[in-house]
Design a protein with these regions (language model features):
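N-terminal subdomain of lithium-sensitive/metallo-dependent phosphomonoesterases centered on the IMPase/IPPase/PAP
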Residues: 1-91, 175-178
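Oxyanion/phosphate-interacting regions
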Residues: 1-14, 20, 174-179, 194-256
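Residue-level signal for inorganic ion chemistry
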Residues: 19, 23, 46, 57, ...
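Generic detector of well-ordered alpha-helical packing
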Residues: 47, 51, 70, 90-93, ...
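Glycine-rich active-site/cofactor-binding loop and its immediate structural neighborhood
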Residues: 82-124
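Acidic beta-strand-loop-alpha-helix segment within the catalytic core
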Residues: 108-195, 244-256
């Protein structure tokens, strides 16, 4: 029997909560930082969080393949893609975790036929979980309480434009800001940027640097469910199943 989106959403939410617990346990202690082949950092928190997420997803839907960042780093990309699969980044913003900036998240997205249909983002230090599984279903859950509905907004007179803190200011970001009258620029780390647009506290997020599909799938599902959009720079909806799971530059926006 194929699990429903509602059951899969609860599995992803459970996985995010289990991952958040172990991440916070490790965050509160001294921890070792190692380097992957691409020289990006990895910690025990990345690995333990990924194990817990995979266990939660496989309990409900063992037939759905899981493409998870640390598994890919250790074993390489899957040879073939199914039409339905999970994309998991167990600790998005590992550098923020290492720097103890609190800017990191847990990203769990479900892809069907090349599009994100379900997403959960956990923000451990804020004790927040954002989730969605279709139009009008985006929610924010605080500290295990009742999920509350959220929606993207039409940009106000002073739109908030988010950018990656890690990659810092760039000419392309400065050029984009020049096209948004009254823009208020706010750099920050992790997939939290998608959540702020989905909940209506930010309006634009242009991304020009490299990202992988597991960085964006959950956030895109949540933003789109909240009434926003995630597109390539030519205006096409960002799709999945690309070579190497790599994204082109993209733009996240609230309601237009």
């Amino acid at each position: 029997m194929t699990a429903s989106h509602a059951a899969l959403l609860e599995a992803a939410r459970s996985g995010a909560q289990a991952a958040a617990a172990v991440i916070l346990d490790i965050y509160a202690t001294p921890f070792e930082v190692r380097r992957k082949a691409d020289q990006s950092p990895v910690t025990l928190a990345d690995e333990e969080a990924e194990r817990r997420i995979i266990a939660a997803l496989e309990r409900v839907a063992p037939e759905i393949p899981i493409v998870a960042e640390e598994q890919v780093a250790a074993s390489g990309l899957p040879a073939t893609l199914a039409s339905r699969y999970w994309l998991v980044d167990p600790l998005d913003g590992t550098r923020g975790f290492v720097d103890r900036s609190d800017e990191f998240s847990i990203n769990i997205g479900l892809i069907e036929d090349g599009w994100p249909v379900l997403g959960v983002i956990g923000m451990p230090t804020q004790r927040l979980v954002y989730a969605a599984a279709g139009p009008g279903t985006a929610t924010r859950q605080r500290d295990g309480g009742k999920p509350e509905r959220i929606a993207a907004r039409v940009a106000p007179a002073k739109p908030v434009v988010l950018s990656s803190r890690l990659h810092g200011p760039s000419r392309r970001i400065e050029a984009y800001l020049a096209t948004v009258p009254g823009a208020v620029h706010r750099p920050m780390g992790s997939a939290a940027k998608f959540c702020l647009i989905a909940e209506g506290t930010a309006d634009h997020y242009p991304r020009y640097g490299e990202t992988s599909e597991w960085d964006t799938a959950a956030g895109q599902a949540i933003v789109e469910a909240a009434g926003g959009s995630v597109t390539t720079l030519d205006g096409a909806r960002l799709g999945y199943g690309k070579a190497g799971y790599r994204n082109p530059p993209f733009l996240v926006r609230g309601r237009t």
